[in-house]
Amino acid sequence: GAPEPSIHRISSPADLTGMGVAFTQAVDQMGTPDRLRLGFVSISTLLQYVDAERAFSFLHVLSRRTSAAGYLGVYSIDPTTHEDRFVNVVTSIFDAAIELREENGDRELRVRGLSDVPPQWTAFPY
C-alpha cells in the first residue's frame, strides 16, 4: 500500500528553524524517496508570525532544498492580503504559479511560468 504521510509538528509558526529541522527529519525517515511532495499550506499565515524578509529567506532555502532533491513543493499564498510587489517577489522563487479566481460564479485557473502551458484563464469544475 501507499506509505503513511510523515507529519511533524513544531512549537510555533514562528519557529523557522524547527520547520527546517522537521523537513529534514521527515525526508530522513523516508530513506531516499524518489518522489516526495511538500505542501506548505499558507505563506499568508506564516507572515502573521514572522516578518517578510525572514519568511522570504526561509521559503527560498526550503524551495531550493526541495528542488535540488527533485521533489515537488506546493506553496499557497492569498494574494489579496499582501502587496502585489511582495507577492511577485515571493512567487519569483518558485518555478511556476497557479492562480485561481472566480468570475461570474465560475472558478478559473491559469498557470504562469511553465513554457509548455499557455498562461490563459481556464474554467475548472469544483
Enumerate the language-model features and the residues they cover.
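General N-terminal targeting signals
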Residues: 55-57, 63, 90, 126
